[in-house]
């Protein structure tokens, strides 16, 4: 009789707590945009956009850490250049989006969060990130993207 075993993947509690706690500003600020007077809405928009840009940069930095922690490339004595490059792109995208006016800057952010999530999932498949990472990252990204779309709609309708 062949036994099939599957390893149960468990997300570390600290990562779970911090990850979901990090959603609070996204959700709260995006909802506040629907009910805020115009003079407060601009400050809320700025706070949400800035928080999203910072978190996007932070998420990209995961790959910098991976590049530093894993063995250096085949004898070159240098970290994985692909991982280093991937780590700085989200910060550059967020910075670029700060120069874009109107609703497009929100689209840039939620597209970047989505793209980075896909890349993170691929990095997990390659063994660069822990198996639990996408199980945390995908639901968080969905909530972030929905919050940013919600904010974009609230701004467009206001």
Language model regions located:
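The first (N-terminal) embedded transmembrane alpha-helix
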Residues: 12-34, 141-148
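Membrane-interface helix termini and inter-helical loops of multi-pass transporters
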Residues: 34-45, 157-158
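Interfacial loop-to-transmembrane junctions
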Residues: 123-145
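Transmembrane alpha-helical segments of integral membrane proteins
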Residues: 111-129
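Short, Lys/Arg-rich, polar N-terminal cytosolic tail immediately upstream
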Residues: 1-11
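Juxtamembrane boundary at the C-terminal end of a transmembrane helix
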Residues: 150-158
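Transmembrane helix-loop-helix
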Residues: 98-115
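Core segments of alpha-helical transmembrane spans in multipass integral membrane proteins
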Residues: 20-27, 48-71, 78-96
């Amino acid at each position: 009789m062949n036994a099939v075993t599957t390893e149960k993947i468990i997300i570390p509690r600290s990562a779970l707590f911090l990850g979901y706690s990090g959603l609070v500003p996204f959700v709260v600020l995006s909802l506040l945009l629907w009910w805020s007077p115009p003079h407060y809405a601009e400050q809320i928009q700025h706070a949400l956009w800035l928080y999203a840009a910072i978190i996007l940069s932070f998420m990209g930095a995961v790959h910098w850490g991976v590049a530093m922690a894993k063995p250096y490339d085949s004898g070159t004595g240098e970290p994985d250049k692909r991982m280093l490059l991937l780590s700085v792109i989200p910060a550059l995208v967020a910075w670029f989006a700060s120069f874009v006016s109107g609703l497009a800057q929100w689209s840039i952010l939620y597209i970047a969060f989505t793209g980075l999530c896909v890349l993170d999932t691929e990095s997990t498949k390659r063994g660069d990130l822990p198996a639990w990472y996408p199980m945390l990252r995908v639901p968080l990204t969905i909530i972030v993207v929905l919050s940013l779309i919600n904010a974009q709609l609230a701004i467009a309708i206001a």
